């Protein structure tokens, strides 16, 4: 049986990258929304806390940012994130979008996994149709 060529390997890497990002999105939203009282307060008032309190929480925030940077870089290495995409900007965009769900998403009335799949679709496959094409 012939060995898969580089194109097949590239598709497999992209699927693996997409799975890593989609899984991270799902876990973030599941955890974030499950502990919404704490996370809501943390996200909304962090900048207003006294410097000493912010400083005590900063290490945990930095570790979480580093985790997301690692996820993004792993996806980039697998061919799932364009080389020109700035890791920090992508992380801030993604976390900001997911954290904003506190404002409008009600886990009692909606499905978190469905929401995560929609976010992953937007991030991984984009919004616009391919240039010159129509869907």
Label each residue range with its predicted role.
Residues 23-30, 34, 66, 70-78, ...:
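C-terminal peripheral helix-coil segments that are non-catalytic and often amphipathic
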Residues 52-78, 88-96:
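Amphipathic alpha-helical packing segments from all-alpha helical-bundle domains
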Residues 9-38, 90-94:
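Hydrophobic alpha-helical connector segments
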